[in-house]
A protein has these predicted regions:
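A charge-rich, low-complexity, intrinsically flexible signal that marks solvent-exposed coils, linkers
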Residues: 3-87
Length: 87
């Protein structure tokens, strides 16, 4: 595993296990979701959720906007966003 991949994994673990009162905005949640999906799965795939599936459609659209971003760039952007929140 590369250093970047390990740091990404550590950052994801930190986010999933973080304690405290921090409640991220929906916008931040979507950004982090999209970066995670782009880093782990690549470009968006599958059918876009229907108009009445507001959450699913928002997630799909956020991920779709990252189309073409490399996994390494997505990992680094995810790490950078969390580091910025921690400071």
């Amino acid at each position: 595993m590369s250093d970047l991949a390990q740091k990404f994994k550590d950052t994801v673990d930190y986010v999933q296990n973080a304690d405290g009162d921090f409640e991220p905005s929906n916008e931040l949640k979507l950004k982090m979701y999209a970066l995670y999906k782009q880093a782990t799965e690549g470009d968006v795939s599958g059918k876009k959720p229907g108009m009445m599936d507001f959450v699913g459609r928002a997630k799909y659209t956020a991920w779709e906007e990252l189309k073409g971003m490399s996994a390494d760039d997505a990992m680094q952007a995810y790490i950078d966003a969390i580091e910025e929140l921690k400071s």
